[in-house]
Amino acid sequence: MIDFLDVQKETPRIRIAIDRVGVKNIKFPLKIHDDFAFLTLNLFVDVPADRKGADMSRAVESIQKVINAGSYGERIGDIGIAICDEALSRFNYSEKAQCEVNIQYYRRSGERYLEYRMYVETAKDRKQIMKNEIGISYVTMTACPCAMETTRALISMDNPDISDAISAIPTITHNQRNVTKLTVDNRSKMITVWDLADVMERVQGKPLDSLLKRVEEGRLVYSAHRNPKFVEDVVREIAYEAARVLGVPDEATIKVSSESDESIHPHNAYAEIDTTAGELRKLHLH
């Protein structure tokens, strides 16, 4: 029997502890009931100063075991905690583990699949969960309120006999695809990524669909124009709604970003909020 040298276990020439050692871009497909998901994962542990390297295969094994053993369903956002726990059980010389998961998720909706992006970022030591953020993003549609009011005024000037009617209905404006992302601190493990999707849908509706029949297309456009929004409106409304309906502690962070692919400009419009549930709950709307 060959006695292989454990090189990783040797003492390094330069004794400096390393904060993050591990694997990046591990890819896994996952089927959840009628849905499909494609996961890209990073997993890191710390390595003490007196150890040359980490056992990289243990990181891959930690990911494989959790994914192959679990049926997550609604709780797919908990996958980071499970992987960190598994890693800490295998890396006996490490004190903390960090896991990052990007998920391309296709959710069955009738005969169609709606596309979501999900995000999990977890950091855990042997005593506590230090970080567990879950997030979701998808593509929607926004209509510009500024251009709408400008065209309303122009139409009324050109057609004074119908100005009263014009003031009561949505008018012409430019619209664009918009990507909105909501991320929430879930160390309390009280919410799921689908709770975040529900918050987004209250403000932005469901993700855009490749297949739209004539009436569906008309309703989508009409809905966006009945409720035109700047990217600033989008992030404010989603942040406020998240704090209102999600049962997370006051200290939980809530981050919202919104980016519109502007149809009349060669640039994008962007807005971002980074605050806490407690700060948002202090607001009194008028």
Curated annotation (Swiss-Prot):
Belongs to the GTP cyclohydrolase IV family. The lineage of its organism: Archaea, Methanobacteriati, Thermoplasmatota, Thermoplasmata, Thermoplasmatales. Keywords: Hydrolase, Iron, Metal-binding. It comes from the Archaea. Pathway: Cofactor biosynthesis; 5,6,7,8-tetrahydromethanopterin biosynthesis. Homodimer. One of its GO terms (biological process) is tetrahydromethanopterin biosynthetic process. GO terms for molecular function: GTP cyclohydrolase I activity; GTP cyclohydrolase IV activity; iron ion binding. This is GTP cyclohydrolase MptA. Its cofactor is Fe(2+). InterPro entries: GTP_cyclohydrolase_FolE2/MptA (IPR003801), GTP_cyclohydrolase_MptA (IPR022840). Gene3D superfamilies: Urate Oxidase. The record marks C144 as: May be catalytically important. It is an enzyme of class 3 (hydrolase). Its EC number is 3.5.4.39. Binds 1 Fe(2+) ion per subunit. NCBIfam families: GTP cyclohydrolase MptA.
